[in-house]
Amino acid sequence: MNDERCDLLCLDAPRAEAIRVGLPGIEAAGEAAERARMFSDPTRLVLAAALGEGEELCVCDLAWISSRAQNLVSHHLRLLRSHRLVTSRRSGKLVMYSLTEEGRSLLHAVLGEKVIS
């Protein structure tokens, strides 16, 4: 007996099919997994959490908050932006960053109630 397999074939085909057709395709699942992977890096997770608390912050503030160099923070923000988890806008000489709705949802899934919405 294997604890990971059923001993009997008792497929509930209609229920299993209804679940199967509602799932994302392998490509969509891969894209979602890649976005989720963005928060596997502690620096990116701290930056996202700071944006979750501060709504909109510049690179200088994020570097100070995270105790990381500005160029490293910029690198991580570019990665988060390329995966549509943060957005940016220029305000004079500053570039301001904020979480997208998708980024906020993913951050909430990772950190739970620790994120202020």
Q: Which role does the model predict for each range below?
A:
Residues 77-78:
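Short, hydrophobic-biased segments on the C-terminal half of alpha helices
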Residues 26-69, 95-102:
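N-terminal helix-turn-helix DNA-binding core of bacterial DNA-binding proteins
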Residues 81-91, 98:
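Beta-hairpin "wing" of winged helix-turn-helix
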Residues 102-108:
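Short, charged/polar, Gly/Pro-enriched secondary-structure boundary elements
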Residues 108-117:
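Short, charged, intrinsically disordered terminal tails
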Residues 1-39, 117:
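N-terminal leader segment of winged-helix/HTH proteins
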